[in-house]
Amino acid sequence: MSEVESQQSQETNGSSKFDVPEIELIIKASTIDGRRKGACLFCQEYFMDLYLLAELKTISLKVTTVDMQKPPPDFRTNFEATHPPILIDNGLAILENEKIERHIMKNIPGGYNLFVQDKEVATLIENLYVKLKLMLVKKDEAKNNALLSHLRKINDHLSARNTRFLTGDTMCCFDCELMPRLQHIRVAGKYFVDFEIPTHLTALWRYMYHMYQLDAFTQSCPADQDIINHYKLQQSLKMKKHEELETPTFTTYIPIDISE
């Protein structure tokens, strides 16, 4: 197991890391090199949630990657067949996604504020990932259009609310859920079916621009190569030779002019 570089220890402004709870998040490692961050959506979502809390100095966060193709003996001993994400709080391991969310919301300082209640937004972003997977598998215009229609609805919502993020000018759990999925759509969609988010969806691009400015996203984001390989494995496609030697790239450019 390896620790990622974005470990957050709160020791500034006279506050010792021992004054706040120490939280460990175990995430899936890259399926290319087995060490860096992998392309698990839930892993990135909870990484972002916890990173935001670490920035607020309510917790000290340690993030550890595990190569699930060759899990180390101590991981197999402690967690058997369980796959990350796994959250460890004061020795207590939380193993299921819904339980992790509930634990962050109810038991981790500041977590309650991340989990805002907004039925409209919850409905708006659900099933987006399903549409991506259907597009990648079916590779037809109908599936492309279904995904495009969904993105248009998100764009219209952002335009109507005229806020920086989904529910306001402060990030919440919905943003930590949506943005990793948008990144997968952007990277995998382009690679496999030449799908691109249209430039006329200006509110959506502005939203992505704001997300790209945040350490919570950039520190948790997997490399383009890992996102692509994630779907190659699902489709039983082969890796390129010496793919582990490639320098990781991260697509974050914005193709339109963003006026603040």
Swiss-Prot record:
Q: Does the keyword Transmembrane belong to this entry? A: yes
Listed SUPFAM superfamilies: GST C-terminal domain-like, Thioredoxin-like
Q: Which GO terms describe its molecular function?
A: calcium ion binding; chloride channel activity; glutathione peroxidase activity; lipid binding
Is the Transmembrane helix keyword given for this protein? yes
TM region positions:
42-66
Q: Which residues form a coiled coil?
A: none
What does the entry give for GO biological process?
A: chloride transport; negative gravitaxis; response to alcohol
Where does the protein principally reside?
mitochondrion
Regarding tissue, the record states:
Expressed in cardiac tubes.
Membrane topology (UniProt): Single-pass membrane protein
**Entry keyword set:** Membrane, Mitochondrion, Transmembrane, Transmembrane helix
Please name one Pfam family that this protein belongs to. Answer: CLIC-like_N
Q: Which InterPro entries does the entry mention?
A: CLIC_N, Glutathione-S-Trfase_C_sf, Thioredoxin-like_sf
Q: Which GO terms describe its cellular component?
A: apical plasma membrane; cytoplasm; cytosol; membrane; mitochondrial membrane; nucleoplasm
Job of this protein: Might insert into membranes and form chloride ion channels. Channel activity depends on the pH. May play a role in ethanol sensitivity.
What is said about the domains?
Answer: Members of this family may change from a globular, soluble state to a state where the N-terminal domain is inserted into the membrane and functions as a chloride channel. A conformation change of the N-terminal domain is thought to expose hydrophobic surfaces that trigger membrane insertion.
Sequence similarity: Belongs to the chloride channel CLIC family.
Q: Mind telling me what this protein is named?
A: Chloride intracellular channel Clic
Gene name of the record:
Clic
